[in-house]
């Protein structure tokens, strides 16, 4: 009787820990986010989880400027 109860308690604890782990899951790279704390790597750039924020260089901004002028 004691073994059955202790095994049941252990399984209940494992199930509870899995439930807590699922509710605090972080967002993977490439998925949408609202803040840095939502992302696994804690970098939310332009509402998307990234490994690091990329800031476009002068050439990229200039090309974008000319595309919008047409």
Swiss-Prot record:
Organism field: Conus imperialis (Imperial cone)
Its job: Probable neurotoxin.
Keyword Signal listed: yes
Record remark on domains: The cysteine framework is XI (C-C-CC-CC-C-C).
UniProt protein name: Conotoxin Im11.11
Alphabetically ordered keywords of this record: Amidation, Cleavage on pair of basic residues, Disulfide bond, Neurotoxin, Secreted, Signal, Toxin
Keyword Disulfide bond on entry: yes
Cellular component, GO, one term: extracellular region
């Amino acid at each position: 009787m004691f073994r059955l109860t202790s095994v049941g308690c252990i399984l209940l604890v494992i199930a509870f820990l899995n439930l807590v782990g699922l509710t605090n899951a972080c967002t993977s790279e490439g998925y949408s986010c609202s803040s840095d704390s939502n992302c696994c790597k804690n970098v939310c750039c332009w509402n998307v989880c990234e490994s690091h924020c990329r800031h476009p260089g002068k050439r990229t901004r200039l090309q974008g400027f000319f595309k919008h002028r047409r």
